[in-house]
């Protein structure tokens, strides 16, 4: 495999679920935990083709890290002031 570029990674794990919409597949993958006492990472991969079926294992899938920001309204519990919070949703895109 060639050297990884900026914001690129590889993924190995087991397909937990997938759905498709808008011409893309969105596959949820569970990767092995770092050790017996930590939680396994859960990753979502966007692709133009299916990566497999539920329960299939995938290895060294080359992806680019992407994401987007979402804002939401909230009320500060101490002051009662209305404000906006922000979440960042990260997603991996299959390099096809």
UniProtKB/Swiss-Prot annotation:
Record GO biological process: DNA replication
Leader sequence segment: none
Source species, domain of life: Viruses
Entry keyword set: DNA replication, DNA-binding
Function of the protein: Binds to DNA in a highly cooperative manner without pronounced sequence specificity. During synthesis of the single-stranded (progeny) viral DNA, prevents the conversion into the double-stranded replicative form. G5P is displaced by the capsid protein G8P during phage assembly on the inner bacterial membrane.
Stated family: Belongs to the inovirus G5P protein family.
Name of the protein: DNA-Binding protein G5P
Origin species: Escherichia phage If1 (Bacteriophage If1)
């Amino acid at each position: 495999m060639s050297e990884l570029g900026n914001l690129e990674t590889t993924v190995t794990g087991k397909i937990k679920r997938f759905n498709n919409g808008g011409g893309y597949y969105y596959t949820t993958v569970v990767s092995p935990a770092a050790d017996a006492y930590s939680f396994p990472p859960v990753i979502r991969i966007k692709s133009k083709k299916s990566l497999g079926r539920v329960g299939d294992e995938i290895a060294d899938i080359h992806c680019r890290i992407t994401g987007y920001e979402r804002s939401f309204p909230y009320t500060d519990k101490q002051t009662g002031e209305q404000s906006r919070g922000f979440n960042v949703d990260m997603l991996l895109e299959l390099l096809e």
